[in-house]
């Protein structure tokens, strides 16, 4: 498939994602977990200014769980059972009583009622799912009216060496387990979500935080 930037991308499916994260699970915390740590920390700091129920989609090994304030009720989901095993170990070892469930679940088919969470956050998720549009609609559906949907993610660029590398990596997305070429317009699809903040994050601005507010009424 050709992307809007002219790179040839491959379609990923659930098996590709599970296979990739089965390989990553044993070393995730010490590799990508470190690279993405600053963005994850910043997102949780923002969420900690809110209250109520939080759904973390793509909770992984639970790296963010100890950083949420104790008054928030946290629910996490992930497609990888290996990642979730590590997250559950973390919850038990650190006594995180505000974590109220970690579930193996497909982000494109969330098993929660509509309007269930005050905040829905997906960190480093949108480039690893086979159908980002479907996932985005599920994030919006499960968020309460007036609540917030937050993304932290890599979004591609046309510029310089980084853009050149992303385009060269695009055909290998199924093996990498993520889409190197991924535009912001792929998540700007839900009319009920208003973008309230977009910010490049440290280090180096590779990752971006996007915050959306869900409309109080449909339409």
What are these regions (language model features)?
Residues 108-120:
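A short acidic, Gly/Pro-enriched loop at the edge of an enzyme's catalytic core
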Residues 1-24:
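N-terminal, positively charged/glycine-rich alpha-helical extensions of SAM-dependent methyltransferases
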Residues 133-145:
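A short glycine-rich, Lys/Arg-flanked "PGG" loop and its adjoining helix->strand segment in the class I
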Residues 119-131:
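A short SAM/SAH-binding and catalytic strip from SAM-dependent methyltransferases
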Residues 34-52:
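Conserved alpha-helix/loop element of class I SAM-dependent methyltransferases that forms part
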Residues 55, 59-109:
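Class I SAM-dependent methyltransferase SAM/SAH-binding core
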Residues 22-33:
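Class I SAM-dependent methyltransferase Rossmann-like catalytic core
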């Amino acid at each position: 498939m050709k992307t809007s930037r002219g790179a040839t991308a491959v379609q990923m499916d659930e098996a590709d994602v599970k296979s990739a994260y089965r390989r990553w699970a044993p070393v995730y915390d010490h590799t990508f977990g470190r690279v993405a740590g600053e963005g994850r920390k910043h997102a949780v700091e923002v969420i900690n200014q809110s209250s109520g129920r939080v759904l973390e989609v793509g909770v992984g090994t639970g790296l963010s769980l100890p950083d949420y304030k104790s008054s928030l009720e946290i629910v996490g989901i992930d497609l990888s059972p290996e990642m979730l095993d590590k997250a559950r170990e973390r919850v038990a070892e650190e006594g995180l009583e505000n974590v109220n469930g970690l579930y193996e679940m497909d982000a494109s088919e969330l098993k929660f009622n509509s309007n269930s969470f005050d905040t829905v956050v997906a960190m480093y998720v949108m480039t690893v799912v086979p159908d980002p549009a479907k996932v985005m609609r599920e994030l919006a559906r499960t968020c309460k009216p007036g609540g917030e949907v937050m993304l932290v993610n890599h979004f591609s660029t046309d510029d310089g060496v980084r853009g050149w590398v992303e385009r060269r990596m695009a055909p290998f997305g199924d093996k990498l387990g993520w889409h190197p070429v991924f535009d912001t317009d792929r998540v700007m699809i839900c009319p009920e979500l208003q973008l309230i903040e977009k910010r490049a994050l440290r280090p180096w601005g590779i990752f971006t935080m996007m915050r959306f507010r869900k409309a109080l009424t449909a339409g």
